[in-house]
A protein has these predicted regions:
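Helix-start/capping segments and mature chain N-termini
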Residues: 1-74, 95-240
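Ordered, amphipathic secondary-structure segments that act as subunit-interaction surfaces
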Residues: 81-92
Length: 240
């Protein structure tokens, strides 16, 4: 059984009070790329988490970037994950992991090895569909948003599709699995802005920066289902 890191201490999930109900508790999360045992954009992930913690719960955290980086490297080693490339999930529990807890706690899990050693652009024509489902505190990486994205994915797969773009009650496409959805028309790339409910992420910042470096005009505008029918390409990013 893989170990996890709870508040800096390495433990087996079976030793936690109730590992399944724990993940149903309110929490914030980040999926983190690691290359060679390190997380190159860890500061961005921690910035997003601390901002969400402050805005949603009015709380501050003293998460140390150097300590979290050390715990990630050690956890990958303990669980014998390949150093080349892996995905790690960092969860922040503002109300604690157990019912009786009264402090903010964090959990680090090794998720899965990744196929590629670095970021890779690849082209695969996957079937995309949309699902209308609003999450509480839209625009933040919450457990509620995670459940809504999973619901959308299962719904689309039952329809025979592969990717689910989640749509809010106003008909705005928020993203795919918590990551940005972009549509490309000519030399223009459009994506839903954070102010319209899209979620900030390290991958979002990277892909928008890459588009600008390639000379594309990046426009943040609320995407709709109808816009998918008129674009040249639709693309998203994933920790894989």
């Amino acid at each position: 059984m893989k170990s996890v890191c709870l508040n800096g201490t390495f433990v087996e999930p079976a030793k936690l009070a109730d590992p399944l109900s724990m993940l149903e508790r309110n929490h914030l999360f980040q999926r983190i790329h690691t290359f060679g045992g390190t997380a190159p954009f860890l500061s961005v992930h921690l910035e997003i988490l601390t901002r969400a913690l402050d805005r949603l719960y009015g709380m501050q955290t003293d998460l140390s970037e150097s300590r979290i980086a050390d715990r990630i490297a050690r956890l990958l080693e303990i669980n014998r994950f390949p150093r080349q490339s892996a995905c790690v999930t960092l969860r922040l529990f503002p109300e604690g992991i157990d019912e009786g807890s009264d402090r903010c706690e964090y959990l680090i899990e090794t998720d899965r090895p990744l196929l590629y050693p670095h970021f890779v652009l690849w082209h695969k024509r996957m079937m995309l569909d949309t699902v209308r489902c609003d999450a509480p505190h839209e625009g933040y990486p919450t457990a509620g948003a995670l459940l809504c994205d999973r619901y959308a994915e299962r719904t689309v797969r039952r329809r025979g599709g592969e990717l689910a773009a989640r749509e809010n009650r106003d008909g705005v496409l928020l993203g795919v699995g918590g990551e940005p959805l972009l549509i490309v028309s000519g030399r223009q790339a459009l994506t839903t802005p954070l102010s319209a409910g899209a979620t900030d992420s390290a991958m979002r910042r990277l892909v928008l920066s890459a588009c600008r470096e390639e000379g594309l005009t990046v426009t943040e505008y609320p995407l709709t289902r109808q816009m998918l029918l008129r674009c040249d390409e639709a693309l998203t990013v994933d920790v894989q």
